[in-house]
Protein backbone atom coordinates (compact mmCIF):
# COMPACT_ATOMS: atom_id res chain seq x y z
CA UNK A 1 0.00 0.00 0.00
CA UNK A 2 2.81 2.42 0.88
CA UNK A 3 4.43 1.86 -2.53
CA UNK A 4 1.09 2.51 -4.25
CA UNK A 5 0.66 5.79 -2.39
CA UNK A 6 4.24 6.81 -3.12
CA UNK A 7 3.81 5.94 -6.79
CA UNK A 8 0.55 7.90 -7.03
CA UNK A 9 2.01 10.98 -5.33
CA UNK A 10 5.15 10.81 -7.45
CA UNK A 11 3.08 10.70 -10.65
CA UNK A 12 0.74 13.47 -9.51
CA UNK A 13 3.66 15.64 -8.49
CA UNK A 14 5.57 15.02 -11.70
CA UNK A 15 2.59 16.10 -13.79
CA UNK A 16 1.10 18.56 -11.26
CA UNK A 17 -2.35 17.09 -11.88
CA UNK A 18 -3.95 18.21 -8.65
CA UNK A 19 -7.45 19.70 -8.88
CA UNK A 20 -6.87 23.35 -8.01
CA UNK A 21 -8.28 26.61 -9.36
CA UNK A 22 -4.80 27.96 -10.11
CA UNK A 23 -2.58 27.46 -13.12
CA UNK A 24 0.68 28.61 -11.56
CA UNK A 25 2.59 27.11 -8.69
CA UNK A 26 5.74 28.17 -6.90
CA UNK A 27 6.98 25.00 -5.24
CA UNK A 28 9.82 23.10 -6.82
CA UNK A 29 7.82 19.85 -6.97
CA UNK A 30 4.20 21.05 -6.72
CA UNK A 31 4.04 20.75 -2.92
CA UNK A 32 1.77 23.80 -2.79
CA UNK A 33 -0.66 22.20 -5.25
CA UNK A 34 -0.52 18.93 -3.33
CA UNK A 35 -1.52 20.70 -0.09
CA UNK A 36 -4.36 22.49 -1.85
CA UNK A 37 -5.52 19.24 -3.43
CA UNK A 38 -5.48 17.31 -0.15
CA UNK A 39 -7.21 20.14 1.73
CA UNK A 40 -9.82 20.79 -0.99
CA UNK A 41 -8.43 24.23 -1.92
CA UNK A 42 -8.83 25.42 1.64
CA UNK A 43 -8.82 29.16 2.18
CA UNK A 44 -7.70 30.91 5.37
CA UNK A 45 -5.56 27.99 6.48
CA UNK A 46 -2.42 28.13 8.54
CA UNK A 47 1.07 26.78 8.09
CA UNK A 48 4.35 26.36 9.90
CA UNK A 49 7.24 26.39 7.43
CA UNK A 50 10.62 25.17 8.62
CA UNK A 51 13.31 25.98 6.09
CA UNK A 52 11.67 28.62 3.88
CA UNK A 53 14.67 29.83 1.84
CA UNK A 54 13.50 32.19 -0.93
CA UNK A 55 10.21 33.96 -0.15
CA UNK A 56 8.69 33.29 -3.60
CA UNK A 57 10.74 31.16 -5.99
CA UNK A 58 10.55 27.44 -5.15
CA UNK A 59 8.68 28.34 -1.98
CA UNK A 60 6.09 25.90 -0.69
CA UNK A 61 3.82 28.41 1.07
CA UNK A 62 3.83 31.50 -1.16
CA UNK A 63 0.82 30.35 -3.21
CA UNK A 64 -1.12 29.51 -0.05
CA UNK A 65 -0.46 32.97 1.39
CA UNK A 66 -0.87 35.04 -1.78
CA UNK A 67 -3.90 33.38 -3.39
CA UNK A 68 -5.66 31.47 -0.58
CA UNK A 69 -5.22 33.92 2.31
CA UNK A 70 -3.27 31.53 4.53
CA UNK A 71 -1.37 32.79 7.53
CA UNK A 72 1.73 31.26 8.98
CA UNK A 73 5.20 31.40 10.35
CA UNK A 74 8.28 30.67 8.26
CA UNK A 75 11.61 29.86 9.87
CA UNK A 76 15.05 29.76 8.30
CA UNK A 77 18.52 29.75 9.81
CA UNK A 78 19.79 32.20 7.17
CA UNK A 79 19.23 35.76 8.44
CA UNK A 80 19.75 37.27 4.98
CA UNK A 81 16.97 35.13 3.53
CA UNK A 82 14.66 36.04 6.42
CA UNK A 83 15.37 39.76 5.90
CA UNK A 84 14.33 39.37 2.26
CA UNK A 85 11.37 37.20 3.27
CA UNK A 86 10.04 39.85 5.65
CA UNK A 87 10.24 42.49 2.91
CA UNK A 88 8.46 40.33 0.32
CA UNK A 89 5.82 38.53 2.41
CA UNK A 90 3.12 39.60 4.85
CA UNK A 91 3.39 36.55 7.12
CA UNK A 92 6.12 36.30 9.74
CA UNK A 93 9.63 35.19 8.87
CA UNK A 94 11.80 34.20 11.83
CA UNK A 95 15.59 33.83 11.69
CA UNK A 96 16.34 30.86 13.91
CA UNK A 97 17.69 27.34 13.83
CA UNK A 98 14.51 25.24 13.65
CA UNK A 99 16.09 22.51 15.78
CA UNK A 100 16.28 24.93 18.73
CA UNK A 101 12.75 26.37 18.51
CA UNK A 102 10.20 25.91 21.28
CA UNK A 103 7.25 25.41 18.95
CA UNK A 104 4.56 25.80 21.62
CA UNK A 105 6.05 29.16 22.60
CA UNK A 106 6.51 30.26 18.98
CA UNK A 107 2.94 29.44 17.98
CA UNK A 108 1.52 31.14 21.06
CA UNK A 109 3.52 34.32 20.25
CA UNK A 110 1.70 34.51 16.93
CA UNK A 111 -1.71 33.42 18.30
CA UNK A 112 -1.65 30.46 15.95
CA UNK A 113 -2.06 27.20 17.82
CA UNK A 114 -3.56 25.35 14.86
CA UNK A 115 -1.42 24.26 11.91
CA UNK A 116 -3.03 22.89 8.73
CA UNK A 117 0.27 22.35 6.93
CA UNK A 118 3.65 21.59 8.47
CA UNK A 119 6.30 22.22 5.82
CA UNK A 120 9.79 20.93 6.61
CA UNK A 121 12.68 21.51 4.22
CA UNK A 122 15.81 21.23 6.32
CA UNK A 123 19.07 20.20 4.72
CA UNK A 124 20.11 17.12 6.63
CA UNK A 125 18.32 14.12 8.08
CA UNK A 126 19.72 14.55 11.59
CA UNK A 127 18.43 18.13 11.80
CA UNK A 128 15.03 17.03 10.48
CA UNK A 129 14.82 14.34 13.17
CA UNK A 130 15.81 16.87 15.81
CA UNK A 131 13.05 19.23 14.67
CA UNK A 132 10.44 16.47 14.61
CA UNK A 133 11.45 15.41 18.12
CA UNK A 134 10.85 18.98 19.31
CA UNK A 135 7.24 19.12 18.11
CA UNK A 136 4.44 17.90 20.37
CA UNK A 137 1.99 16.51 17.82
CA UNK A 138 -0.55 15.69 20.54
CA UNK A 139 -1.36 19.36 21.17
Feature-to-residue mapping (PLM):
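Residues that form generic nucleotide/phosphate-binding pockets
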Residues: 8, 12, 38, 106
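Extended hydrophobic/Leu-rich segments
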Residues: 1, 5, 9, 98, ...
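SAM cofactor-binding core of SAM-dependent methyltransferases
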Residues: 22-104, 124
Amino acid sequence: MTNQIKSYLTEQTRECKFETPVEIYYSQSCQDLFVLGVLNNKENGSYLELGCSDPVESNNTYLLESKFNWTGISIDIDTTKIDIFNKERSNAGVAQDASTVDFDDLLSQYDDNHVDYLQIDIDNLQATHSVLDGIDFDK
